[in-house]
Curated annotation (Swiss-Prot):
Keywords: Cytoplasmic vesicle, Differentiation, Nucleus, Repeat, Spermatogenesis. Its main location: cytoplasm. It holds the Pfam family MORN. It is found in: Cytoplasmic vesicle, Secretory vesicle, Acrosome; Nucleus. SMART domains: MORN. One of its GO terms (cellular component) is acrosomal vesicle. This is MORN repeat-containing protein 2. It comes from the Eukaryota.
Length: 79
């Protein structure tokens, strides 16, 4: 698949965004089965670059993501 699309996994995870060669690649949103969500850049199925992560408590974190590492994330405060 190439271009924009949506993939629903049997686990409950959902990816909606850009695909390249059947991989998450470009801008997209990945919703985890537990309800947490990442929105941002993907590179060959891996989170890579600027993005936002919303955890299961609704806290929003933003910053640079590099596959399994996300140094210097910033918590967004809503007042």
């Amino acid at each position: 698949m190439n271009g924009f699309g949506r993939l629903e996994h049997f686990s409950g995870a959902v990816y909606e965004g850009q695909f390249k060669d059947n991989m998450f690649h470009g801008l997209g949103t990945y919703t985890f089965p537990n309800g947490a969500k990442y929105t941002g850049n993907f590179n060959e199925n891996r989170v890579e670059g600027e993005g936002e992560y919303t955890d299961i408590q609704g806290l929003e974190w933003s910053g640079n993501f590099h596959f399994t590492a996300a140094p210097d994330l910033k918590l967004k405060l809503h007042m």
